[in-house]
Design a protein with these regions (language model features):
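Conserved, carboxylate-rich catalytic/transport cores that coordinate ions
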Residues: 1-303
């Protein structure tokens, strides 16, 4: 489908292009309604026969991926909307919503102060416009060195998505109702949602009651653990990849700075490491928190 979307001929080309056109319309509508437009990259590892990292692949989202994503989002949204309108003898069907609250205003103000150090400003007074304003900023700086750092800080300023029985909507996707429905073989939340939907469509007798609150808390907690485990495993295999390359030179981009040094991410493989302040060559450097820069005492060189 990727090749057909990009203009080549193939089986079901008319159907695939129609699906792609609809997906792009759905995406444009979400963004117009205030959905966050975050570009992500995924690191994949190719292992040799001994289990060591042989090479890295950086996967970036293409139109074919976005096509699948939009229809998954549509299915999740429609299921949540459908069940939310149904009632049982208790007037409300217990359900697992995927919720993403509005960002905390204090965190947004900190983000605003942070980007001012790079010469950028966004309007933060209207909570309903914050996502649009951040999208516009990220679009303007897409090919600048500070893009990845500012996008990372924008994500950190947002609330964390969780599972709840009381729906508050999904801010990041600009949906009033949302759930996780499309992956019951790998997420317990989706399995619960399938059960509730099946019961709603048939008997309207539901096995879940107040215990669904505890289930939501548990799967939210386990999700955070899974994310942390994935992050640590990525770092582990990246370390295995570079451990035998000590002494080689790579192009990199500063991905973060702090009082004790700076973080640098290699451009070709996304491996990241920290350079202690005293080991930055060419000068004696200090951290300027007001300007969010590392500055050389003699040369005035900045990072």
């Amino acid at each position: 489908s990727k090749e057909i979307i990009e203009g080549k001929e193939g089986d079901f080309q008319d159907e695939i292009r129609s699906l792609d056109s609809i997906a792009k319309t759905l995406r444009q509508k979400r963004l117009k309604n205030g959905a966050m437009n975050i570009e992500s990259e995924e690191v994949r590892f190719v292992l040799d026969e001994t289990g060591h990292t042989d090479s890295l692949i950086i996967k970036r989202s293409k139109d074919a991926h976005k096509l699948v994503e939009e229809y998954m989002l549509l299915a999740n949204r429609l299921v949540a909307t459908f069940v939310s309108k149904k009632k049982d003898k208790h007037n409300r069907i217990p359900f697992v919503y995927r919720c993403h609250d509005k960002p905390d205003q204090a965190k947004i103000e900190l983000f605003s102060l942070f980007i001012k150090k790079f010469g950028y400003e966004i309007e933060t007074n209207d909570p309903n416009r914050i996502s649009n304003n951040i999208n516009a900023l990220l679009g303007d700086i897409r090919y600048k060195n500070e893009y990845s750092l500012i996008q990372s800080m924008a994500i950190r300023s947002m609330a964390k998505a969780v599972y709840e029985t009381d729906n508050v909507g999904h801010y990041g996707l600009a949906f009033d109702f949302y759930t996780h429905f499309t992956s019951p073989i790998r997420r317990y939340a989706d399995l619960v949602v399938h059960r509730v939907l099946q019961e709603t469509l048939t008997s309207n007798k539901h096995r879940y009651g107040d215990e669904l609150n505890d289930i939501c808390k548990r799967i939210s907690r386990m999700e955070r653990k899974a994310v942390e485990a994935e992050r640590e495993s990525t770092k582990f295999f990246q370390t295995l990849f570079v451990v035998d390359k000590i002494g080689e030179e790579f192009d990199g981009t500063v991905s973060g700075i702090a009082e004790f040094g700076m973080f640098v991410k290699m451009d070709e493989n996304q491996c990241e490491g920290m350079i202690p302040m005293q080991e930055i060559p060419g000068d004696r450097f200090r951290f300027d928190s007001d300007k969010f820069q590392i500055i050389g005492s003699k040369t005035g060189k900045t990072y």
